[in-house]
């Protein structure tokens, strides 16, 4: 019998037992898989769940207690869950991606196993759009390279020296920016770009007609048209099996000679080997990438290590302190809706609803009538936000989850490339929930 049939102790595939909550049951376990700061999530979940962290980068690093007992999981983009990984979780009912993108989760397999997958689609729209414009401005005005020249001791005084060090700087007004994917982030980028004087084109075959008139943009019907007419191309679509390596050796040759390329969406959209070659040959004048095929990114290895005129940042376009707190709060609220309501009906942003084979109603729970000693609390209640500490010195919320050999001196701290490239005029199918649900984060 396969492992997937053993997950639920005899229940059919895709049907998982409900979370048992209420006065006669312990609080269910919710785990943050790839982080260790739960201070934002705790106030939202502490009366309905025990919250723990794993700080793992793979399921091999997740403690057996979480694999056996966790009913909910929170995760960022730094861990990947394949079907094999998902089958290790015996009681999991919901995963919430703290961010918009969810290409690091096999959502179909999760649905087959009865696990709902949710995201935070409006997360970091402003931050990602701002970061995109920052990259575009850097490419046009060469700010990064000018700074680097001064840091390296280059003397810049005469007009000739300025011309030399600022070679390649260009005027923005009148240039054409091509946006691939006009979801939330794409629209925010378009509005900012227009304010800087760009003519803005976009390609999005799955967006309804009319948005271009409302925003004052020009729509093109094929990817080839956008690449041919754009001085700078920026990507704002999700990643799936249809658009992996959307920018490849073939599509690079369809771009204008000397165009710029910006990617703050998903690393797999760009064939980095083809990009490196295009940068070396000058077919692409400059590129700025916040996301990469292999993360964490390093200039010391991979095809981009010797590429000229390249700006790289570490998948941070989404980040601001405000955005981080907002997305964590919303992710925690989604977990709470799952525990106290019905899956998937009570969920706000379930991305694999069509794949779920069953929806189990979980009894609602009134925390006001739950006695602490019967609500999974083996220790007395503390003021809001305080986590008690077990005799071992490990916070009670994580005791038995973090291996005893690990010293904790503190509490919870504040697709394969398709065999052929897209042909001219071919539409490229994005995923159903792209960055209108995006990743950029």
Curated annotation (Swiss-Prot):
Which source organism does the UniProt entry give? Mus musculus
Q: Under which EC number(s) is this enzyme classified?
A: 1.1.1.-
Among SUPFAM superfamilies, the record links this protein to: Formate/glycerate dehydrogenase catalytic domain-like, NAD(P)-binding Rossmann-fold domains
* Active site (catalytic residues): 266, 295, 315 (proton donor)
Q: Where is the composition biased (Basic and acidic residues)?
A: 430-441
User: Does tRNA processing show up as a keyword for this record?
Assistant: no
Give one GO molecular function term: chromatin binding
Residue segments, region Disordered: 409-441
Modified-residue entries (Phosphoserine), positions: 300, 423
At the top of the EC hierarchy, this enzyme's class is: oxidoreductase
Q: How is the cofactor bound?
A: Cofactor binding induces a conformational change.
**The name this protein goes by in its record:** C-terminal-binding protein 1
Q: Where are the transmembrane segments?
A: none
- Its quaternary structure? Homo- or heterodimer. Heterodimer with CTBP2. Interacts with ELK3 (via its PXDLS motif). Interacts with RBBP8 (via its PXDLS motif). Interacts with PNN, MECOM and ZFHX1B. Interacts with ZNF366 (via PXDLS motif). Interaction with SATB1 (non-acetylated form); the interaction stabilizes its attachment to DNA and promotes transcription repression. Interacts with PRDM16; the interaction represses white adipose tissue (WAT)-specific genes expression. Interacts with GLIS2, HIPK2, FOXP1, FOXP2, HDAC4, HDAC5, HDAC9, NRIP1, WIZ and ZNF217.
Q: How is it modified after translation?
A: ADP-ribosylated; when cells are exposed to brefeldin A. The level of phosphorylation appears to be regulated during the cell cycle. Phosphorylation by HIPK2 on Ser-423 induces proteasomal degradation.
Annotated residues for binding of NAD(+)? 100, 180-185, 204, 237-243, 264-266, 290, 315-318
Tell me the function of this protein: Corepressor targeting diverse transcription regulators such as GLIS2 or BCL6. Has dehydrogenase activity. Involved in controlling the equilibrium between tubular and stacked structures in the Golgi complex. Functions in brown adipose tissue (BAT) differentiation.
Q: Which residues lie within the region annotated Interaction with GLIS2 1?
A: 1-70
Region Interaction with GLIS2 2: which residues? 288-360
